[in-house]
Amino acid sequence: MEFSQEAFLAFLLAAKRATYAAQGDDVTVPALLPGARQLEYRDGAFLYRDVYFGGAYFVGQETVYYEDVPIWAMSYAGGVAPTITADAEIGAIYAFLRTALLQGTPDRPYRGPQTFQDGPYTYADDSAGGLHAFWGRETISQENRTIYALRYSGGFLR
């Protein structure tokens, strides 16, 4: 089972951009687990699968397979502040999040860029480690108030 880190990174970024961040339903497949949403993206021997539960607050896991063997995973949990309940506001925050996630780069492939600002929202991501083992926290703020937060961790499986 041989693949280069460059090929893996290119695939991971393409998969993330084509799934949740794309804002479309083209990659939604029937979920393996009851009550979950499942997104998948395949290119050659690589398969990306994102399975999550919830909406305003959610928990999920991304897994990358190579030749049908799981090789990398990231678990995550987070959501909008509990005081935010209006569907329109939640929708606007998640639309901004998707825009931020489209800005991921090979040196920051887990979520979005270190910082990103558009309109009233500011996205920030603080992570540590590398592809083999990492963890981090992303936030969205508005007028110096955190309105969304998510924690994540993962790495290559051994």
Predicted regions and their residues:
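Cysteine-centric segments in proteins
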Residues: 1-158
